[in-house]
């Protein structure tokens, strides 16, 4: 398999498959796909040191739009939230709405990938 064939195969994958591929590559090669924090230029002499920025540890997953495939999105919402059919339908029909709040970044990304795989528009805050 050459480079172009690999790229084409990746282009044809669904979001959830890409997430699984990245995890497998991280485990196989002992690396992280997280973007490194870019170093900001050295402060100018006499400039006050900037306060350290706290990294966010909990995230909210917001369903912005269910898309054209509402039934499949509804099933995923029920699976994620444990809501009944009526409650999940009301949530999906009244977007934008939070699906899950106070979750880890990894869990938020997994939820987003599942919903986007079914055609939903999702935001992580």
UniProtKB/Swiss-Prot annotation:
The encoding gene: rplL
Family the UniProt entry places it in: Belongs to the bacterial ribosomal protein bL12 family.
InterPro entries: Ribosomal_bL12, Ribosomal_bL12_C, Ribosomal_bL12_C/ClpS-like, Ribosomal_bL12_oligo, Ribosomal_bL12_oligo_N_sf
Stored NCBIfam families: L12 (TIGR00855)
Alphabetized GO MF terms: mRNA binding; structural constituent of ribosome
Protein name, per record: Large ribosomal subunit protein bL12
Quaternary data: Homodimer. Part of the ribosomal stalk of the 50S ribosomal subunit. Forms a multimeric L10(L12)X complex, where L10 forms an elongated spine to which 2 to 4 L12 dimers bind in a sequential fashion. Binds GTP-bound translation factors.
Keyword annotations: Ribonucleoprotein, Ribosomal protein
